[in-house]
Amino acid sequence: MRLLRYLHDFRTLPFFVLFSMAVGIGIGKAFGISDYELTPPIDAIKDIFRGRYDFTIGNTLALGVVAGLFLMIYPAMTNIRVDDLGAATRSPKQLLIVAFANYAIAPFFMFALAEVFLRGDEDLHTGLVLYGIAPCIAMVIVFTFLALGNTPLALVLVAFNSVAQMILLPVYAKILIGNVDFDVLVVGESVVLYLGLPLVLGLLTRRAGVARLGEAGFERFREGLNTLSVVGLLFTLVVMFGLKGDLIVNDPMIVLRMAVPMTIFFFVMFNAVYVAGWRLGFNYEDAVAVAFNSTGRDFEIAIAIAITAFSPAVAVATEVGPLIEVPVMLSLVWIAMRSGQRLFAAPVAPLEAALVPSDGPGGAGGERRGAASSAPTWSERPRPM
């Protein structure tokens, strides 16, 4: 129980993140896979079903990205009711903000940052721009969940981004990069793998769990599932740093050169949209969901396109992305929860209290606030001065 509290406590979670990175780099060095050429997860799964996948140490570890993402997303999906999804679809203002941020601002903002910081390096420039044109369709649900945001709304926004980027991704690639030859179906396949499968299993788990254990019993069971999100996050970090640790050890300047514009992008986009949501009268949960859906980038799609349509150097540039994005987005979760206590009338519960069962009678102290609770109580912000 004490370990669970440490995992969910944002005062100690950064140490687990750093430890996972170090373990990943150590594993990569020990097995000689720290500069591994990644196969896009979708292609790897197809090859497995066709009986053509070579289960080397590196290839097997690479499948851990898929497993880690599932472990992160599935617990959040068990937190969702079908009725919550119906209510979340009636949020046109939130949807418009996400659409404007992701398709009118984000691609061009990332392009401007690439021009400022990477103008002399065509490969890194292309990799950064490519990373910026595709909104995230998976991990933003996890970060919304960790920040105690509106997970059903985040899911609806992700579904919108999934469809929109299938149409707009080739357009932005053409405008900002030039002629790019890639299959847009890879976006649809990623939606099924990272969104559809966890959603279906999560809804089925909730339905079966409530039928067998009752609402209160399932909530206590789900508190244990919540730990999988953090475990999946740390496991994904181990895998990514294990396969690409040489980027940091042998050529840290590549990471640093990519880290500066990417960190600026994430902090500016998140805080701008988060504050905009507050000013527009959103409650904390909605403001967080909208901000993360406007900030996160789809590194799986960016890497897949880079591998299939560009030089290896561009692929390396996109592979740096998640090494930077995940720790930065975790810091944004911390910022959201800290600032939420000041900006919004209803205080935001500490993360460890929200995700770990209490020691009191019944152990029900970990019930989350928000759309997934049986009686949602949305916080309302005070009128800005």
Residue ranges and their predicted role:
Residues M1-G366, W378-M385:
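Alpha-helical transmembrane segments of multi-pass small-molecule/ion transporters
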Residues G366-A372:
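Short linear segments in intrinsically disordered or otherwise low-structure-confidence regions
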